[in-house]
Amino acid sequence: MRAFRSAANFGAASNIYRKSFTPASIASNRFVSARMSSIMTDNARPNTDKVVQDIADYIHDYKIDSSVAMETARLCFLDTLGCGLEGLKYQQCANIVGPVVPGTIVPNGTKVPGTDYQVDPVRGAFNIGTIIRWLDFNDCWLAAEWGHPSDNLGGILAVADWQTRSAKAGLEGKVFKVKDVLEGMIKAHEIQGGLAIENSFNRVGLDHVVLVKIASTAVVSGMLGLSREQTADAISQAFVDGQSLRTYRHAPNTMSRKSWAAGDATSRAVNLALLVKKGEGGMPSILTAKTWGFYDVLFGGKEFKFQRPYGSYVMENVLFKISFPAEFHAQTACESAMLLHEELKKLGKTSDDIASIKIRTQEAAMRIIDKKGPLHNYADRDHCIQYMVAIPLIHGRLTADDYTDEIASDPRIDALREKMECVEDKRFSEEYHAPDKRYIGNAIEITLKDGTVLDEIEVNYPIGHRQRREEGTPVLLEKFARHLRGRFPEGQVEKILAASNQDIVNMDIDEYVDLYVKKD
C-alpha cells in the first residue's frame, strides 16, 4: 500500500501504475495462477469418457423395437416438416436459407423441403434445421434443460437425402428409407432428452442447442458408417466445439438468432462427423480433463447426472405443440386464456373490463417467459407469457401472425400485460419434473372492474402431451395438412398426404423429399 500511495506524486504516470495493479487484475492473476497450477502434465492417453462411450454404444448397439416410439416418430416427422413449411412464409426466415452462393445447385445434394434449393449436406442441415425451428411450433422436451429434439431432423434428413441420392447416382452413399430417418429421430430425441433430464445447461448460461449438436453428431456418425471409436471421436468434437450462450433468448438481448441457433448446431454436427470420417480424431477425456475439459470450463466442475439408460423414452413422451405457436411453458396458459375469453363473451364482457389477472405457473416459466417492459420484436413476444395470454383474451386466438409488429401495436395488449401477476405454484414445478407426469401446468384467475372474480381455469398438460395423445393426434394431422396447404397447390398436397400414412416407412427418403419441392 505504501507503493500505491507514493505513486500519487508522479502525476499522470501514476494512473498507469495504479491501473496495472487494480483488484480486478490481481484477482485475474490469482485465477490464472490457480488454473496453471492444476494443469495436467501426464500425457498418458486416458480411456474415453463414459458419457461419450455410452452415447456411441447406444448408436451402434440399440435396436428400436417400440411401436409407440415409431408411430410417435412418424407424427413428429410430419409435424416437423409442416412447421418448416410454415416458417418459410416469413421473409426473415426465407432470407437466410438457400445456398451460400446464390444459384448454386449441388449435384445429388440435399433438397430443402418447401423450396427448389439443392445444397451440400452441411448447408442443407442449416436450412432444414432453421425452417423447422423458426416459429417455435415443433415439438418440445421439458426437464432440467429445455429443448426441441426434432431440431435434429435438420442434420438427419440432410444426410439421409444426400447419401441416398449419391448412392442412386453410383457414388459413395447408402439408400435410406423413411424408417431409417424415424429411427435416427428416436435416437436423437433420446440422447438430447436423456442429457436434459437431470442436467441444466441454462443455469450455467449455455443454450440448449449444445444438446442438438451432441445428438445430431452421434446419429449422423452412425448414418455415415463411422465406427464405434469414430463415433466417440465425433461426439468429443461436438463437446469441444464452442457452445452458444443463452443471451439471445433473454431480456434485454432477445432476438432472431434463437430461431436459427438449432440449424447452426445441427449443421455443425454434420460438418464434424464428416471431418472425423475423413480421418480427424477425438479427445477421449473431453468432459473430464482437469482444467481444460467441458466440466471444468463450462459446467462449473460438475459431472452429468442421468435418470435412466438410453432407450426410446423421450420420443414416447415428447410434447407436441398443436394448438398454439407459443413457448411451451405457456401452452396451458394460452389454453386457459382461450377458455376465459369464451367466459367473458358469455358475460357480455371484453378484455377491456378486466381489472387484474393472476397467473399461477411453474418455476421454469418464471425464469424464461415472465417478462415486463417493452417487447422489441417477434422473438421477444413469443417468449413473454403475458403477451401470449393477452392475445387470446383479446382476440380469442393465438397464431404466428399475432407476434408481428402490426398486431403488437394494439395498445390493449400492453395495457393488459400491466394487469398481470405471475406467481410460482410449487405443485406445478414438482409435477413438471416428475418422470411419470411431466406436466406443464398453468392457471389463470381474472378479476373484473366491477369486482366479479371469474372461476380460475387450470390446465395441467396441453393437448400435445402423451396423456392426451389420442385426442391430439387428429388435431396434429390437421395442423400438418394446414401447413401443407399454406405452401403447395392442392394437387401436391394430396400427393403428400397420400404418401404420409403408416406405410411411409417403406419409402426411399429421397422420393418422399421430392414431393416437397416447391416449383415457382
From Swiss-Prot:
InterPro entries: 2Me_IsoCit_deHydtase_PrpD, MmgE/PrpD_sf, MmgE/PrpD_sf_1, MmgE/PrpD_sf_2, MmgE_PrpD, MmgE_PrpD_C, MmgE_PrpD_N. Several bivalent metal ions, such as nickel, copper, zinc, mercury, and lead, inhibit the activity to some extent. Inhibited by structural analogs such as citrate, cis-aconitate, isocitrate, 2-methylisocitrate, tricarballylate and fluorocitrate, but not by trans-aconitate or adipate. It is found in: Mitochondrion. Pathway: Organic acid metabolism; propanoate degradation. It comes from Yarrowia lipolytica (strain CLIB 122 / E 150). Gene3D superfamilies: 2-methylcitrate dehydratase PrpD. Optimum pH is 6.5-7.0. SUPFAM superfamilies: 2-methylcitrate dehydratase PrpD. Component of the methylcitrate cycle that catalyzes the dehydration of 2-methylcitrate to 2-methyl-cis-aconitate. The methylcitrate cycle is a metabolic pathway for the consumption of propionic acid. Optimum temperature is 25-40 degrees Celsius. It holds the Pfam family MmgE_PrpD_N. Monomer. Disruption phenotype: Leads to lipid accumulation and increased citrate production when biodiesel-derived waste glycerol is used as substrate. This is 2-methylcitrate dehydratase, mitochondrial. It catalyses: (2S,3S)-2-methylcitrate = 2-methyl-cis-aconitate + H2O. Keywords: Lyase, Mitochondrion, Transit peptide.
